[in-house]
Design a protein with these regions (language model features):
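Residues at or immediately flanking beta-strands
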Residues: 77, 139-141
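Cyclic nucleotide signaling catalytic output domains
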Residues: 123-134, 141-148
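Short loop/turn elements that form and flank the Walker-type P-loop nucleotide-binding site
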Residues: 28-29, 136-139
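Short beta-strand-to-loop capping motifs
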Residues: 38, 87-92, 146-147
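Conserved long alpha-helical elements within nucleotide-processing catalytic cores of c-di-GMP signaling
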Residues: 4-5, 10-32, 39-66, 78-82, ...
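Conserved helix-loop-beta segment at the catalytic/binding core of cyclic-nucleotide signaling proteins
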Residues: 61-95, 107-127
Length: 148
């Protein structure tokens, strides 16, 4: 049996999220669908572990929920689908919501790192090997935005 809520984010997921998005598409009202992913999340998870990574997902959900509460409408939907955060909003201009969401996450995500990683502006990956590189700090990125 598939859960209706994601255990890490607390947001609707799976069939519940898919049904809500489908319902809004059937209604004869304009809306914007935005999907977000967290770049640098894999490197963070590898270095800091899954428990800290789960906390980052909770934080991401909180940022998105707060942005929708502040800048959205009561009919808006927030979910987590296929490893991405989803906002479906009926606001005419979602740019303010988008800027609030991304800005709050990107600034707050720095608190999950050590001071050294923040000073370096990233995580040193494959240290001491030919593949050594700096993986930038996590950023919330718009994966998809569509006006429907």
């Amino acid at each position: 049996r598939e859960s209706l809520y994601d255990s890490k984010t607390g947001l609707p997921t799976g069939p519940m999220a898919e049904e809500e998005i489908a319902r809004m598409k059937v209604e004869d009202e304009a809306f914007t669908e935005m999907r977000f992913s967290i770049s640098g999340f894999g490197a963070f998870n590898d270095k800091y572990g899954f428990m800290n990574a789960d906390t980052v997902l909770e934080f991401g959900a909180k940022c998105i929920y707060e942005a929708v509460t502040e800048h959205g409408t009561p009919e808006d939907f927030v979910g987590y689908l296929d490893g991405k955060f989803v906002i479906v909003t009926k606001v005419d201009d979602p740019d303010e919501m988008l800027a609030h969401t991304v800005g709050q996450f990107n600034e707050g995500a720095r608190a999950f790192y050590t001071f050294i990683d923040v000073d370096n502006n990233g995580i040193l990956v494959n240290e001491g090997t030919a593949n050594e590189h700096l993986e930038p700090l996590m950023q919330l990125e718009v994966h998809q935005q569509a006006d429907v």
